[in-house]
Amino acid sequence: MKSNKFTTSQLTILGLMAGILFLMAYTPLGYLNIGPLAVTFNVIPVAICAVVLGPTGGAVAGAVFGLTSYMQAMGIGGASALGSALFQISPVLTAVQCFVPRILDGICLGFIYRAVHKKANTYVSCAVTGFFSAFLNTLFFMSALVMMFGNTELIQNLMGGRNVIIGCCMMVGVNAISEMVSSTIITAAVGTALSKAHLIPASQIAKPDTAA
C-alpha cells in the first residue's frame, strides 16, 4: 500500500511553492499583461507540487493559486481587470471560476506525471507535466468562463461577436503559448533537480530513471 504521508522536505517544498505563488501573484513576477488576459507563470509552482507531491499536492497548490486569483478579483493586494469585472457580476461564480479550474489542473498534473514516468525519464516527464499545467489551466479556465459567464455582456464584448471557440482562441492566443513554453522549460529543470535531490517520492515514480 502506498503511503500518502509527506516527508518534512516535501512539506517544505509545498510551503515554499505556496509562498512563491503569493509572491508571484502580487509582484510583476507572476503576470505579464497582454490584452484582456494576462500571461500567468503561477502554473509553474502548481506543476512542481504535482511532480513532487502527486495529485494531492497539485490540488493544494492549485487551491492557493485560486485563492490569490480570487483575492485579486476582490481587489485585495492588487487587482485583476477581468477578475474584478466578473466579481461585480457574481462573487460566487467568480469563486468557482478562480478555484475549480486550478484545483482540477493540479490533480490532473499529479496523475499525468505518474503516467508519463512509466514510459519516460524524469526530465521528459517533468517537461510534459509543465506543458499540461499551462494547457489544462487555459482549457479549464476558458471552459468555465464560457459556461458561467458566456452570455454576459462582458464576455460577449470580449468575443467581439465571433464564434465562441474562435473568440476564446483569439483571447488566449500568444498568452497561452508563452505560458506553455515557459512552464515546460522551467518545470523540467526544477523537477529534474528535485529528483536528483531525492525529493520525489517512490509513489510518484513508476520505475527507476534511465536518464536524469
Question: What spans do the regions from the language model cover?
Answer:
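Loop-helix junctions at membrane interfaces
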Residues: 1-212
